[in-house]
């Protein structure tokens, strides 16, 4: 298996569900992770939970709000993550989803 220790990752849709589990595993394996979600409250809660659970500081995990349907949010996420993670991104997990506005 690929050694992710000291790698840098962005995970969209990481405040809950599979995205949160991906983040948890990468943090357990020593990866620095930038969490991202449209839900700011849940995102910050997830960040805090991981910091307490794994004894991590602000240098190991961050949260950036991102609506993946908005190009400017992607730009802000990428720039913030590279700055926080102090280098290029090694892993990108696009977990956030979009649903079409359809009336049933």
Predicted segment positions?
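Canonical Rossmann dinucleotide-binding motif of NAD(H)/NADP(H)-dependent dehydrogenases/reductases
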Residues: 2-34
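Structural signature of beta-strand start/N-cap positions in the alpha/beta core
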Residues: 8, 32, 62, 88-90
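Rossmann-fold scaffold of SDR-type NAD(P)-dependent oxidoreductases
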Residues: 12, 89-97
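Generic hydrophobic, amphipathic alpha-helix propensity
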Residues: 18, 43-46, 50
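Amphipathic, non-transmembrane alpha-helical secondary structure
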Residues: 20, 24, 28, 44, ...
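Conserved glycine-rich Rossmann-like NAD(P)H-binding loop of the short-chain dehydrogenase/reductase
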Residues: 31-46
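Conserved amphipathic alpha-helix within the SDR
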Residues: 47-51, 61-65, 70-87
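Conserved mid-core segment of classical short-chain dehydrogenase/reductases
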Residues: 99-104
């Amino acid at each position: 298996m690929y050694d992710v220790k000291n790698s840098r990752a962005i995970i969209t849709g990481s405040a809950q569900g599979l995205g949160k589990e991906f983040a948890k595993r990468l943090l357990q394996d020593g990866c620095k992770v930038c969490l991202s979600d449209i839900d700011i409250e849940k995102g910050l809660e997830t960040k805090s939970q991981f910091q307490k659970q794994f004894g991590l500081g602000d240098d190991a995990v961050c949260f950036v709000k991102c609506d993946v349907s908005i190009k400017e949010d992607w730009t802000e996420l990428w720039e913030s993550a590279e700055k926080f993670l102090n280098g290029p991104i090694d892993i990108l997990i696009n977990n956030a989803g979009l649903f079409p506005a359809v009336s049933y």
